[in-house]
Amino acid sequence: MLVRGHWQTGRVPERDLLVLTEEPLNAETRLDRQRGRIVPAGRHYVRTHFAIPVGPPEVLIKGAARAPRSVTLEEIRRLPPRTVTVTLECAGNGRRFLDPPVPGEQWGLGAVGTAEWTGASFHSLLPGDWLHGAVEILFRGADEGVPKDLGRRIAYERSLPIDIARGDDTLVAYAMNGEGIPREHGGPLRLIVPSWYGMASVKWLAEIRLLDRPFDGFFQQDRYVIEGAPLRNIEPRAVITSPADGADVYGRSLEVRGYAWSGHAPVERVDLSEGGGTLASTTLPADTAPHAWREFSLRVALDPGEHVLIAQAIDRKGNTQPLSPRRNALGYANNGARATRIRVRG
């Protein structure tokens, strides 16, 4: 089916994506269709807050004491290009499993995906002296609407600290997996903030503003916060993609596969357990893509019968995925380990 004409990559591939809502468009990747390190645009999850706009081909930049200037897509393309492999995860990924339920899109575990993003490092768009006196940089998208509990029309906008915005891998991107960014993924220009939850990677980028005080807008103070603190780095998580939850498997030797990621540091180990006892562990080798998920594979021998498998991610800084969810009012950063239940038939 077509989702109101927005799906630039063609018809919504229902075998790959589960559409939660059509307007605004929210769709997650089916776990059994997560294959390979790089997720094609048509299989990558989509998160929108309002109707999908036609993104502008230029970005307006405003400084406190500077005359506004516009930078066009073609001008950005002429800047030194940089390609970064980035895992983006919606902050609400896993919300569906909270009990009692909390408000928000009821994502399973498919609101995550990895792509190769190409663009210009943000810091190359403006001279360094523009940042004098700035404490944050605000990024506004072309998408606008009325949040249910706000009652007035606003644009989607988020700010970044100066040090994060100036990182080499923070991009104003114009390509996804080597092609122009599809409309549903924020093209033609999108901010990419590696290692942070996806809310920071503002889509349909329309305006950049240098601020002399912290931003306190709706999507910074009322949404994407836990106990008043705006969300930042992605928490560690491992997800089993094979075997599927509820599957019957044949033979006692079983390969367990999946993905693991963290926005604090690359994942270095995945533990597989059952009933509190470790079945197997794998140490992942060093990787040249620090902002991307890691594929893992573990082989275990299981007796016939029912089994409950749990995968846990541990990153290089020692951050460990919790076994239980950490509850908060809107169900953000719920990275509690999820059980995969299978039946082994000998």
Q: Language-model features: where?
A:
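Structured, non-membrane catalytic/scaffold regions adjacent to prosthetic-group chemistry
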Residues: 2-346
